[in-house]
Amino acid sequence: MSLNPRDAVIVDFGRTPMGRSKGGMHRNTRAETMSAQLIDGLLARNPKIDPAEVEDVIWGCVNQTLEQGWNIARMASLLTRIPHTSAGQTVSRLCGSSMSALHTAVQAIQTNNGDVFVIGGVEHMGHVSMMHGVDPNPQLSLHAAKASGMMGLTAEMLGKMHGITREAQDQFGYRSHQLAWKATQEGKFKDEIIPMEGHDENGFLKVFDYDETIRPETTLEGLAELKPAFNPKGGTVTAGTSSQITDGASCMIVMSAQRAKDLGLQPMAVVRAMALAGVDPAIMGYGPVPSTQKALKRAGLTMDDISHVELNEAFAAQALPVLKDLKLLDKMEEKVNLHGGAIALGHPFGCSGARISGTLLNVMKQNNGTLGVATMCIGLGQGISTVFERL
């Protein structure tokens, strides 16, 4: 396809191995250090790109306190080969933070406000718990359902509204682990994981080039034995069908098509369309439906045109209604999350948007796909979607 000089293209993508937040590989690595090592690793394998050309480091992070505070984008950038003359900003759109970071870079490129951006995100949920320092306004319950801030209960609500059974959720959770393990065994994550030093369960320092969150031993029988995690009486959502609490970071190099051409780079993909949407916070997990419909309309496409989809697996009870209403349930095995998802890999909030986008691009490359959608729900009722075309 012919590109406009101001089209925004993805030049490369990398991520850390995903670590368990409780005693995991990253337990002795700080969030900004992890981010810096990832950024340096991605730039090191792209020697044609001069770090001094980076206009801005745009980094998603949700709980911006402790080691994730004081503008972690800048804090991480100062630890890398990127010179002090490049800028840095931290973005929070909760679960959609690093996809918003991507959108911000794309919008800047399209409006001639920069040519080279480093985007991504991090969340070290082992060091900074999701509720640390958070003080929700008690008056929120006058404007939205009281349970809107309790993600597990919103998933229960959405699953109940759409008739999603416990068995269907368990099957979805099992699928995530099996596909992620299969992708690992077949080397499908090799291009996207930047190996990192970390500590194993015995405390020994080693290099990790795989995700320690995947549980290949998962069985449907084992999942069926788990108790409801959020609604003890009649609930269907369990720990086994929820995204894992994980430590990790993801990163992309985003450029104008003209600058990529000037440097002789072959981009992975071009961003065709982007969209956001809001929904009732009580069913926050439904957000990807309107945001994806909006993004496809902006791209002049329908879901039938899309070869592959990455939907963040916040909860099986949330993902299945989204897939149902996007008319993807009967095409799930050929199109959706072919390398598993957040149930197996985890959902480090600030990291996930860029992570699913980059995984999508690799899935498309490995399966000769042309058009793809990355989409995710966002706490308190939002959806975010990006349409990519592989180059």
From Swiss-Prot:
InterPro entries, A to Z: FadA (IPR012805), Thiolase (IPR002155), Thiolase-like (IPR016039), Thiolase-like_sf_Thiolase (IPR050215), Thiolase_acyl_enz_int_AS (IPR020615), Thiolase_AS (IPR020610), Thiolase_C (IPR020617), Thiolase_CS (IPR020613)
List of catalytic residues: C95, H347, C377
Any single GO BP term: phenylacetate catabolic process
TM stretches of this protein: none
Designated gene of the protein: fadA
Gene Ontology cellular-component terms listed: cytoplasm
Protein name: 3-ketoacyl-CoA thiolase
Sorted UniProt keywords: Acyltransferase, Cytoplasm, Fatty acid metabolism, Lipid degradation, Lipid metabolism, Transferase
EC number: 2.3.1.16
UniProt KW Calcium keyword: no
Gene Ontology molecular function, alphabetical: acetyl-CoA C-acyltransferase activity
The organism of origin for this protein: Stutzerimonas stutzeri (strain A1501) (Pseudomonas stutzeri)
Task of the protein: Catalyzes the final step of fatty acid oxidation in which acetyl-CoA is released and the CoA ester of a fatty acid two carbons shorter is formed.
Oligomer status and interactors: Heterotetramer of two alpha chains (FadB) and two beta chains (FadA).
Gene3D superfamilies tied to this protein: 3.40.47.10
Family of this protein: Belongs to the thiolase-like superfamily. Thiolase family.
Catalytic activity: an acyl-CoA + acetyl-CoA = a 3-oxoacyl-CoA + CoA
Pathway(s) it belongs to: Lipid metabolism; fatty acid beta-oxidation
Record's subcellular location: Cytoplasm
